């Protein structure tokens, strides 16, 4: 899948905290969120120039430039200057934050979901809540978890740009060779564990499943659906304290530990990079991954299937790592209005189908199902595309975007890694991660 980044970008967030703080107090001229147009009235016919940092590589940038030109043609009073904004998507947060200080930030930019809270609390974003709540926008067609990511302290700072989710991908040949029935949409985690054990063949060096123990966010976010399905929480309601070390969190990690240590059915990847190629090659029977794998699955001609995640107590809840188009405030009612209008056009059913689906991503809206672009996309990336689209309904809550999540994720990843390699108990490791995360979360 040709997405700009999966599963989660966290590195850049550590380096820009001071810039964001400086931007909040620099007096650079941008007004607080939602202030544009408080007294003045937006004139949709006024000449306006807006800047859009897409955060995309060359192929995607060209596609988006074409859409901007199309909008310009239909709205000749609006000039949209489009560029990637930075050399890589990871660098965008640093660039935007520096722009807050110098007054050179854009009107619209791509942002990883992990940056949402930091940007939303900078004092430089628009609040477009009133706009997205208009009936014609059909805001609820976008998955709830993605909408929540774009909402900071009750303010809607933008519109989701990309949605995804984690599902179960299985290699049909490995199942056929072992004489094991394929996974079904109503599988429990006990079904998953039993199948993984049957599929593991030490003589042939085939594992039933895999898990990253690199300690990265790839390690961490795979635990969260199991925690949620058990009824647990990642953070306290105010986002200031860890809650993952609850009885539910311990039970979720103990389940994975049983597969890794007791069953020895789990390949432990030290790098994040090995388990997918091993799955393609038939050395791993099942992996937990997302629609970004569809391109490689097609390219490698893998015979595979996709189901929702297995469930605890019938709950197939999964997780998403949505990214966001963030709209910025320049204390200019016409710039704010034009930016909002363009953003709603860009993320409409008709236009998103020509962007995300054309680029191989999941559609942003449920209403895109059945469009010609959707039909082509589903056929091009069969059999996995439709199940991953359907799995969006199992995204019930957002992954945290609080500033301290980046640091917390590192400690949780280290805890999971230790437990799955037999170096600690789930309780001790998660308690230690919670303690280590306290300062980062209490900001």
Name each model-derived stretch.
Residues 195-198, 238-268:
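Glycine-centered hinge/linker elements that transmit conformational signals in sensory
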Residues 116-123, 146-183, 212-238, 320-328, ...:
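Periplasmic solute-binding protein
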Residues 70-142, 177-179, 278, 285-286, ...:
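Extracytoplasmic "Venus flytrap"/periplasmic binding protein-like
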Residues 46, 73, 178, 258-263, ...:
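Extracytoplasmic/periplasmic substrate-recognition and gating elements
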Residues 1-50, 73, 428-431, 435-443:
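Short, low-complexity disordered leader/linker segments with a strong preference
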Residues 383-433:
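C-terminal capping/gating helix-and-loop segments adjacent to ligand/active sites or protein-protein/ligand interfaces
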Residues 113-165, 219-222, 303-305, 375-380, ...:
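Hinge/lid segment of periplasmic solute-binding proteins
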Residues 40-43, 129-142, 185, 207-216, ...:
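Short, solvent-exposed loop/beta-turn-alpha elements that line the ligand-binding surface or hinge
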């Amino acid at each position: 899948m040709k997405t700009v980044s999966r599963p989660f970008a966290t590195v850049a967030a550590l380096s820009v905290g001071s810039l964001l703080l400086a931007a909040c107090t620099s007096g650079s001229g941008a007004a607080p969120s939602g202030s544009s147009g408080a007294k003045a009235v937006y004139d949709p016919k006024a000449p306006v120039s807006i800047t859009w940092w897409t955060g995309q590589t060359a192929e995607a940038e060209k596609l988006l430039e074409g859409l901007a030109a199309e909008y310009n043609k239909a709205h000749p009073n609006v000039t949209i200057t489009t560029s990637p904004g930075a050399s890589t998507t990871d660098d965008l947060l640093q660039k935007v934050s520096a722009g807050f200080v110098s007054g050179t930030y854009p009107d619209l930019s791509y942002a990883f979901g992990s940056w949402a809270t930091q940007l939303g609390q900078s004092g430089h974003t628009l609040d477009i809540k009133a706009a997205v709540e208009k009936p014609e926008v059909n805001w609820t067609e976008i998955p709830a978890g993605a909408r929540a990511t774009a909402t900071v302290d009750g303010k809607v700072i933008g519109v989701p740009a990309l949605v995804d989710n984690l599902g179960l991908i299985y290699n049909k040949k490995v199942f056929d060779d072992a004489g094991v029935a394929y996974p079904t949409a109503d599988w429990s985690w006990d079904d998953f564990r039993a199948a993984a054990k049957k599929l593991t063949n030490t003589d042939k060096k085939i594992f039933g499943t895999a898990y990253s123990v690199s300690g990265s966010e790839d390690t961490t976010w795979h635990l969260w659906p199991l925690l949620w399905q058990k009824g647990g929480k990642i953070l306290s309601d105010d986002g200031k304290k860890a809650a993952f070390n609850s009885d539910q969190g311990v039970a979720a990690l103990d389940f994975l530990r049983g597969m890794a240590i007791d069953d020895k059915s789990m390949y432990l990847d030290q790098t994040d990079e090995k388990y997918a190629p091993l799955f393609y090659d038939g050395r791993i029977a099942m992996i937990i991954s997302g629609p970004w794998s569809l391109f490689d699955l097609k390219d490698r001609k893998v015979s595979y299937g996709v189901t929702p995640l297995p469930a605890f107590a019938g709950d197939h809840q999964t997780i998403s790592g949505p990214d966001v188009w963030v709209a910025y405030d320049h204390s200019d009612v016409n710039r704010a209005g034009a930016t909002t209008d363009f953003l709603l056009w860009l993320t409409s059913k008709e236009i998103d189908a020509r962007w995300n689906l054309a680029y191989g991503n999941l559609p942003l809206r449920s209403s895109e199902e059945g469009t010609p672009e959707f039909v082509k996309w589903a056929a091009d990336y069969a059999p996995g595309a439709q199940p991953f689209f359907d799995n969006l309904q199992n995204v019930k809550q957002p992954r945290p975007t609080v500033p301290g999540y980046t640091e917390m994720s590192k400690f949780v990843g280290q805890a999971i890694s230790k437990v799955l390699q037999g170096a600690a108990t789930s309780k001790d490791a998660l308690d230690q991660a919670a303690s280590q995360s306290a300062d980062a979360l209490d900001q």
